């Protein structure tokens, strides 16, 4: 016959085993959630540093129009590059100090010419960047159309962006002007867009004009409801 002390000891052991069993059961049930949190933590460490106090310029346009080249030219240094969490794309951020003014320039994943509801996750990330970060948009046309998209398609993309984000000023850049001889086809689009700038990002032509425009961009004051 066991004495009371031994019985109580075995009872405590049994209760602890029951508790451990319940805890293990709960952990198993939420294991997928815990694994996802570990994954998210690892990815968020690679997120580029975004300065929400700086004037933010978001570069937009189809792939291969010269966005990365332009970012390098304006920032004057290698931009910060990191994978955007939960996507296979990367975003690049360049930082510029001009006349005691901090400017950050963000190169987003390429936007495609179709309704927002049809966009994939990568494209929606670019939309979020435009909506919540941009104080101005640098929209780049490939005047040579060597990017694989005609000027009409690029113009339609611009109109889509302007319609969705009608409170954000847009600066129109026509890139790769060094590759075309007859500019009459380009000028029919330029005539519809005030303050367009002809540039060659790879040659560095027109960068001074862009910098002057960026100096005039004012930060948009957003309330909490707009930001979240």
Ranges and model annotations:
Residues 1-14:
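Single conserved hydrophobic/aromatic residue that forms the stacking wall/gate
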Residues 23-47:
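N-terminal pre-Walker A segment at the start of P-loop NTPase domains
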Residues 75-104, 112-125, 151:
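Switch I (effector-binding) loop of TRAFAC-class P-loop GTPase G-domains
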Residues 178-228:
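Canonical P-loop GTPase G-domain recognition
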Residues 46-54:
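Phosphate-binding P-loop
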Residues 124-195:
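Conserved C-terminal guanine-recognition region of P-loop GTPase G domains, centered on the G4
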Residues 55-77, 89:
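Glycine-rich phosphate-binding P-loop
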């Amino acid at each position: 016959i066991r004495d009371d002390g031994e019985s109580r000891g075995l009872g405590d052991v049994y209760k602890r085993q029951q508790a451990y069993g319940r805890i293990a059961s709960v952990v198993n049930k939420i294991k997928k959630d815990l694994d996802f949190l570990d994954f998210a933590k690892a990815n968020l460490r690679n997120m580029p540093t975004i300065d929400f106090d700086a004037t933010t310029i978001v570069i937009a346009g189809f792939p291969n129009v010269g966005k990365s080249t332009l970012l390098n030219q304006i920032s004057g240094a290698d931009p910060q590059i990191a994978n955007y969490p939960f996507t296979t794309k990367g975003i690049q951020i360049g930082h510029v100090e001009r006349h005691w003014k901090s400017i950050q320039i963000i190169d987003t994943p390429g936007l495609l010419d179709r309704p927002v509801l049809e966009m994939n996750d990568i494209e929606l990330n670019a939309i979020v960047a435009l909506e919540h970060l941009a104080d101005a948009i640098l929209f780049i046309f490939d005047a040579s159309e060597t990017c694989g998209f005609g000027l009409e398609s690029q113009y339609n993309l611009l109109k889509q962006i302007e319609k969705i984000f009608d409170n954000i000023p847009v600066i129109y850049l026509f890139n790769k002007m060094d590759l075309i001889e007859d500019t009459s086809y380009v000028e029919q689009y330029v005539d519809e867009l005030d303050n367009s700038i002809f540039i060659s990002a790879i040659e560095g032509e027109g960068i001074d004009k862009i910098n002057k425009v960026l100096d005039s961009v004012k930060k948009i004051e957003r309330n909490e409801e707009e930001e979240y």
